[in-house]
Structures are given as C-alpha cells and as structure tokens.
Amino acid sequence: MRIQSLLLLGVLLAVGSQLPAAFGRKKGEKSGRCPPDDGPCLLSVPDQCMEDSQCPFTRKCCYRACFRQCVPRISVKLGSCPEDQLQCLSPMNHLCHKDADCSGKKRCCPSACGRDCRDPARG
C-alpha cells in the first residue's frame, strides 16, 4: 500500500510539473497577458523583475516604458486581431486599451492610427 501511494504521488508530481507547458505557458508564468506598452521609453530605469514568479499575487512581469516591472495582468478574449493594411495619415487617440474595454467578442487591436475595438479575425 505504501509503495502504491508513493508511486501515485510521483506520477501526480510529474504530471503537475508539465501542466504549464501543456497550456502554452512556461513554468512560473502566470495566466493573462501584459497590458500594451504605450508609454515613452525611460532608459535609465533598471528592470524590477525578470519573470512572473518574482511578482506578487497575480501581477505579471511586463515591459512598460522600456523596462520590466510587475503590473496587473489583463485577460484576453479568444481569436486574433485582424491585420491592418492601412497607413495612418494622422494618428488618433486609442479608443481602447485592453480587450475588456470592448463589448461582446470584440478585441482591442492595434491599427495604423491607434487601438480600436474589432471583431477577431477568422481562421
């Protein structure tokens, strides 16, 4: 009985260590995505983290203003943003900053003139 318990524990530990990779994440990487980095570059600021495991709670280690720091993660909707073939003549303000700013299944996507809410690409 004791050998079976140890064997079962070993199998569970082995499978559990592979779960992040099975879900497309590296070991220690937290769920969610980094918010867009729209800030100006602050070159003299040192990185505050190198990976998600160095950040408290649900925060993620993300590039913000050209250095890494722990920031609140954002959730991402299914689907990918469509490609934008246009060129912008006069940049406009962002109409969204994250997927949660968009209604329904729409995603906050980068475009030639800024971010806006769009239906995800098909295929």
Swiss-Prot record:
Mainly resides where? secreted
Name one process (GO BP) from the record: antibacterial humoral response
Which UniProt keywords are listed? Answer: Disulfide bond, Protease inhibitor, Repeat, Secreted, Serine protease inhibitor, Signal
Write down the superkingdom of origin. Eukaryota
**GO annotations of cellular component type:** extracellular space
SS bonds (residue pairs):
34-62, 41-66, 49-61, 55-70, 81-109, 88-113, 96-108, 102-117
Task: Tell me, in a sentence or two, what this protein's role is.
Answer: Putative acid-stable proteinase inhibitor.
Q: Protein name, please?
A: WAP four-disulfide core domain protein 5
The reply to whether Membrane figures as a keyword in the UniProt entry is no
Q: Entry's SUPFAM superfamilies?
A: Elafin-like
Question: Which residues are in the WAP domain?
Answer: 27-73, 74-121
**Which positions carry the signal peptide feature in this UniProt record?**
1-24
Which Gene3D superfamilies does UniProt cross-reference here? Answer: Elafin-like
Looking up PANTHER family in the UniProt record yields: WAP FOUR-DISULFIDE CORE DOMAIN PROTEIN 5, WHEY ACDIC PROTEIN WAP
Molecular functions (GO terms): serine-type endopeptidase inhibitor activity
- Localization annotation: Secreted
